[in-house]
Amino acid sequence: MDFSDPGTLIANLETASHRARLYQTRVIRKTLGYLLCNPEICPELGQSTQRDPFAGKHTNKTNDSQNQDLRSSERSALVLSPTGSGKTFMGLATASILQRTYGLRVGWTAMRRNLLTQAADENVAFGFNVDMQTISMFDRSPPQVDLLIVDEAHHDGAMSMASLHSMMRPKLVLGLTATPFRQDRIKLCFEKVIRDVSIRELIREGWLSKFDHYCLDTYSPQSVAQCWLSDPQSWGQAAAFFRFKSEADECARMLTQGGARAAVVDGESDREQQIADYMNGKLDVLCSMLVLAEGFDCPQMKTVFCRPSSKGPAVQICGRVLRPFPEFPVKRIVQCRDTNFPFTRIADPRYKFTFQDGAWKSLTANPNIEEIAKQMEQQIAQPLTPSTSMSWIQRNSRTRSRGSIVIPQ
């Protein structure tokens, strides 16, 4: 397939990019530049558009045949971008440009049916109208395509994804994921990993919500239920994540007994109906394991309770609550002291709170501390009289000090 002469492609790229955020345009350019091996599309890639001789070699030996099938495509790239950054938009934009320019047959595959439905819906909503096949990763007779887009492309689907590749042999493969696992077999099988923007940057630029961080002493069905029931209005609609289904069941039971409308989302429940009820305000809290950690977008969610976990699950879970919602400009993330990976390592919260002596106490320094320091310097430089001293004390005693138990709404 001839991918030379990028003139028409660049024109189509400019047409698609007028709706994209700046970082999305950069990602789309990098993706096209690498997949088409053409630095004219994205000059900053330079020589990186050449094949990486080490790509895909650090893989699990027990799955070597599957990894080899995955690398059999002509070119493959993995877009690693945070939850809420618009990965579906970037994937659809890339597919639209390639289809308009070269007439490629496009396929979109995912592990979960709701991700396929979401991609099809956004294809229409964004106005891309890509002619594409939605393909289950378990399809035994998939259609032949030139470009295969793999949504949520991480290790859970390694075997199924490799099997799908062996049957389809697409010319180009584009993976989309927010999962930052360094050890992912799938990630290591792609020739190029494309990164551009971090969660911290997305929050700073307003594409993701600011958040306050709360730390429980222990994380259990009881502590989560008691926390939410202590102030339902303040915590708002929430999602609580647990390691085991029995824990999710117990938390939902306690919440229900306390007057909350709660449901457990698992592999056997009517997930689509539960999410619809939640979106329509008929449920207050969804309790789950990792079922809701992918492809669950609900901007109106105000709080997420994240079980103790490593970096990957923590980022997946906490990212669920960061989609902007006008009524809640600041969201809430609740973890515990025992977690292996506090989300505060990823992004800076507005305020940090810890639960001590039956109340939430602030760990955040007075936000006016710099201004207070400047005023102190000015006062020191001036002759101190009883009137000026009392005026300064009264003025600054009104500021919130460290250790306050006042929780911002």
List each language-model region with its residue ranges:
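Conserved pre-motif I regulatory segment
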Residues: 2-77
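Walker A/P-loop
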Residues: 44, 72-93
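Conserved two-lobed SF2 helicase motor
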Residues: 127-138, 280-294
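Post-DEXD/H (motif II) to motif III coupling segment of the RecA-like Helicase ATP-binding lobe
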Residues: 158-207
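Conserved interdomain linker/interface between the two RecA-like ATPase lobes of SF2 helicase motors
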Residues: 195-246
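Conserved helicase ATPase core of P-loop NTP-dependent helicases/translocases
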Residues: 261-290
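A short beta-strand element within the Helicase C-terminal
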Residues: 296-309, 316, 331-335
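Conserved segment of the helicase C-terminal RecA-like domain
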Residues: 321-347
